[in-house]
């Protein structure tokens, strides 16, 4: 029933539209045209204005032909860099870029799958219940679209986000994440003529970082320092450095413990030096902690999981529940009371120029989504 050629054409069309974070207007317009041609009612919310983007989240609703609880389907429209000027190449059944950019299968493979699913339903006059499609902006830079989604437009209480790799899995657990920013203030001085008059902010930050346990802490907790910015010239003792990092965990107690350890390491180094310094108030430390997203944990006996597993069974497949180390729009929907499982599209090596997605995987994902909608309508 899936039109492979059409699915491939749709994905290639979408992949080659520039849509890096905060610049999703062009792809949103094209998705809107396709959905309107199939009879959808469309809204664009005000998320773009709130986050400094050129458009908001795109919400499309289909009334359905049968009475059933509304079902949410989600994908995000933005991509990471390098994501401009993409050429999508299909070879031996696998899409890649030309090697100079990402492909954008994350998450345009999901958009193509959702659009193909709706086309199949409409052209075959299949029974279906109300559908609420949510195509978000700025997922890649902090789930910002989902965080600013106009919930007055959403009535669904369960749904599926297509933003994982494995087409034979459903992600039911994802971690909480804290974002941390440290600004270490030192004192500038000439590095050659009078280095002893300076306080090297980079050196202090380095000591604090050296005292941290980074990488995989345990099976459900990670810690990372990802950005260090500071210094103006090699002959100047740097008076400021900014360090940014994150902690993720499926356990809130562990999340808070590692977050506290990071803060303590920086504070300890700065306070220790300050105790030996004759410069009033220096060195100094500014600390910011922001909750990026909260963990999700959907029980295996929840209807959103059971429905997807039944659909897979009907197709002669077995869907396995999975745990993710990353965040997705589903984390935010979960916070807002919408139980959202995350399904795979087959995408691989996301966020790299080696990114790929197999057409067979996209077909399998479409078949699963069709069966989920069919069963949901019957239930």
Could you describe each region identified by the protein language model?
Residues 1-25, 291, 350-352:
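N-terminal capping segment at the start of a domain
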Residues 20-67:
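A non-catalytic alpha/beta surface segment that caps or lines the substrate-entry region
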Residues 28, 53-57, 61-63, 67-130, ...:
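Active-site metal-coordination/substrate-binding segment of hydrolases
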Residues 48, 77-79, 134-142, 164-166, ...:
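Acidic, glycine-rich active-site loops and adjacent beta-strand->loop/helix elements
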Residues 78-93, 171-183, 309-310, 341:
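Acidic-glycine-rich active-site phosphate/pyrophosphate-binding loop
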Residues 90-102, 185-189, 315-316, 347-351:
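Glycine/charged-rich beta-loop-alpha catalytic/anionic-binding loops adjacent to active sites
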Residues 101-175, 217, 234-235, 246, ...:
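Acidic/histidine-rich catalytic neighborhood of metal-dependent amide-processing enzymes
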Residues 202-379:
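Metal-dependent amide/peptide-bond hydrolase catalytic core
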